[in-house]
Amino acid sequence: MSAPTFRLCPADIGLEVAFAGRSNAGKSSAINALTNQRQLARSSKTPGRTQMINFFNVGDADRRLVDLPGYGYAAVPLEMKKEWQVELEEYLVSRSSLAGLVLMSDIRHPLKFFDEQMLRWAKDGELPVHILLTKADKLKYGASKNALLNTRKRLKELGLNCSIQLFSALRKEGLDELAGVMGNWYEYQLDADKIIESSFALLEGDELEDAIEQDALQKDSSQQDSK
């Protein structure tokens, strides 16, 4: 893998809300709109290639917003996709500080296969999920409402109880509803002006390679100790 794994996450304390979605679902745009900052969440020039897990403090160090790597992009090698799936499942099921998941899905193509897999993992971990049907500005009002109703129907078929809303980062529509959901999970009134990027999210170059190497050594050591 070309970036740190979930084993390199900060201490599993406090409360986290994770943002997840396909590589073209508008995840970075949603985070930037929520925080009213253009470049807080950075997109890779090649969708699906960025595997960095970014953490942002929300008010204090015990409340974090987690920007998970995008998934599902066709240009990513199959083996890399498999690695990501293992890492994502481990994080969603075992991360005790994770208070909720915001899942982004393009309103024009809602709930693709891996979106539904993410929802199943969240259900296995008894994790609350709030779905954003992103890019709502791409459809007319009636079509957007139909997409919302159809997605709710699909969730019911899957036996999933998730809250869901329309969202447009471009028009900044749906921000108050999203902030309200996140505030309930954080047990805190969300103030976008206090969301700041944490230093531990900025591993690059040699520092990044060192982190990956240390993670591999720790994993090998753990496997040997278990024998």
Swiss-Prot record:
General function of this protein: Necessary for normal cell division and for the maintenance of normal septation.
GO CC annotations, alphabetized: cytosol
Binding-site residues, GTP: 21-28, 48-52, 67-70, 134-137, 167-169
Cofactors named for this entry: Mg(2+)
Keyword presence, Magnesium: yes
Classification lineage: Bacteria, Pseudomonadati, Pseudomonadota, Gammaproteobacteria, Moraxellales
Domain spans labelled EngB-type G: 13-188
Similarity-based family: Belongs to the TRAFAC class TrmE-Era-EngA-EngB-Septin-like GTPase superfamily. EngB GTPase family.
Alphabetized UniProt keyword annotations: Cell cycle, Cell division, GTP-binding, Magnesium, Metal-binding, Nucleotide-binding, Septation
GO function term, MF aspect, one: metal ion binding
Keyword Chloroplast on entry: no
GO biological process per UniProt: division septum assembly
Domain of life: Bacteria
CDD domains listed in its UniProt record: YihA_EngB (cd01876)
Gene name for this UniProt entry: engB
Listed NCBIfam families: GTPase_YsxC
UniProt name for this protein: Probable GTP-binding protein EngB
Chain positions recorded as Mg(2+) binding sites: S28, T50
Signal peptide start-end: none
PANTHER family cross-referenced by the UniProt entry: ENGB-TYPE G DOMAIN-CONTAINING PROTEIN, MSS1/TRME-RELATED GTP-BINDING PROTEIN
